[in-house]
Amino acid sequence: GFEVIAQAKLGGQTYTVALGREMVALAGAHTVGFARMGNLPPSAGAQLEIR
């Protein structure tokens, strides 16, 4: 299989996260809204809870 990688900006910092997981764990981060971009599937536009 493969993982879809996307970048999320939060507090001026850019995080690189792998989509397709129920949650992406980033320390001290809040909910991030991913903008749809390039070849990412519609699910990439969904918000992921970061906790």
UniProtKB/Swiss-Prot annotation:
GO terms for biological process: hydrogen peroxide catabolic process; response to oxidative stress. GO terms for cellular component: extracellular region. The keyword Transcription regulation does not apply. Its main location: secreted. Its EC number is 1.11.1.7. It is found in: Secreted. GO terms for molecular function: heme binding; lactoperoxidase activity; metal ion binding. It catalyses: 2 a phenolic donor + H2O2 = 2 a phenolic radical donor + 2 H2O. Keywords: Calcium, Heme, Hydrogen peroxide, Iron, Metal-binding, Oxidoreductase, Peroxidase, Secreted. It is an enzyme of class 1 (oxidoreductase). Its cofactor is heme b; Ca(2+). The keyword Iron applies. Ca(2+) binds at residue 31. Removal of H(2)O(2), oxidation of toxic reductants, biosynthesis and degradation of lignin, suberization, auxin catabolism, response to environmental stresses such as wounding, pathogen attack and oxidative stress. These functions might be dependent on each isozyme/isoform in each plant tissue. Belongs to the peroxidase family. Classical plant (class III) peroxidase subfamily. This is Suberization-associated anionic peroxidase 1.
